[in-house]
């Protein structure tokens, strides 16, 4: 091979390698406010993206894939109760409870279901019965999965169950959050921190560090979904209803705010 051709190929290859993370960041940053096409029987439980061109919406008994404009690309019926979800290496991981939530005696039936992010085909089911009050939310950090869920009345802390890539429990973390109604609904790790959406009156956003030490407790509704998309940029979900009572889903840009937790951006 001629030296000039070899040099050109090396330059192109290097540019491609260097450009790949930049393109990924650009793609993530291109996510904007969006409404999910269609209406659904049950309310939104969580959202995530593939960090490129798709948004995933969990409507309790419907799992929906849309493009960045909210146009449905794929939709499947799923078992109740499919909760929050996260994306990792081409797969969706969904927190699923087939039993009772928030029961002091347990009686939950907690799982993580794994789907192909392109086709929504079911790949695997992992038991997570350690999530005693019902698996409702999930996030991923450094290739490990963190499952959250229900909570009985009066319990003044929340729990995070850490699993390895094979869904073997490695640790149960305690968040000194104070009581949150029905536990934690949604979870995402972004910008070096955990963000947890909770029910309540008012609804609560919890923020912790990587060791689940409290960084903030804010009166903000992220209980239907929260996902990071770029540095200093997240999407939070809303779930209005139609006049017939059918459930809708939308995502709204937000940025971190020291006093409020997050602020919607115009």
Locate each region found by the language model:
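Short loop/turn segments that connect beta-strands within beta-propeller blades
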Residues: 67-71, 116-120, 164-168, 208-211
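Repeated scaffold domains used in trafficking and secretory/extracellular systems
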Residues: 41-46, 79-87, 130-140, 179-186, ...
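Short coil/turn segments that connect the beta-strands within blades of beta-propeller domains
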Residues: 52-53, 89-90, 142-144, 191-192, ...
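A short beta-strand motif characteristic of beta-propeller blades
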Residues: 31-38, 70-76, 121-128, 169-177, ...
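Structural motif
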Residues: 64, 102-113, 154-161, 202-207, ...
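Blade-loop segments of beta-propeller domains
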Residues: 70-102, 107-110
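Conserved beta-strand positions in repeat-built beta-propeller and related beta-rich domains
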Residues: 56-60, 94-106, 147-155, 196-200, ...
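Beta-strand-rich domains and repeat architectures in extracellular enzymes and scaffolds
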Residues: 34-61, 81-84
């Amino acid at each position: 091979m001629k030296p000039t051709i070899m040099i050109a190929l090396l330059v192109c290859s290097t540019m491609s390698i260097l450009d790949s993370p930049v393109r990924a960041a650009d793609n993530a940053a291109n996510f904007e406010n969006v409404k999910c096409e269609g209406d659904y029987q049950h309310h939104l439980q969580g959202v995530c993206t593939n960090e490129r061109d798709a948004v995933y919406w969990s409507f309790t008994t419907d799992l929906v894939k849309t493009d960045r404009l909210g146009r449905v690309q794929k939709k499947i019926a799923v078992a109740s109760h499919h909760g929050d979800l996260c994306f990792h290496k081409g797969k969706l991981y969904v927190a699923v409870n087939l039993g009772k939530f928030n029961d002091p005696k347990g009686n939950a039936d907690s799982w993580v279901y794994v789907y192909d992010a392109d086709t929504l085909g079911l790949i695997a089911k992992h038991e997570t019965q350690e999530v005693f009050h019902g698996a409702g939310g999930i996030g991923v950090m450094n290739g490990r999965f963190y499952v959250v869920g229900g909570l009985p009345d009066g319990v003044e802390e929340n729990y995070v169950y850490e699993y390895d890539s094979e869904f073997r429990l490695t640790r149960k973390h305690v968040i000194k959050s104070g009581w949150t109604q029905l536990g934690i609904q949604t979870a995402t790790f972004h910008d070096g921190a955990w963000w947890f959406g909770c029910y309540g009156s008012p609804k609560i956003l919890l923020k912790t560090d990587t060791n689940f030490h409290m960084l903030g407790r804010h009166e903000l509704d992220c209980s239907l979904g929260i996902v990071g998309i770029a540095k200093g940029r997240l999407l939070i979900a809303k779930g209005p209803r139609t006049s017939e009572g059918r459930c809708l889903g939308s995502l709204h840009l937000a940025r971190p705010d020291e006093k409020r937790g997050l602020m919607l951006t115009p």
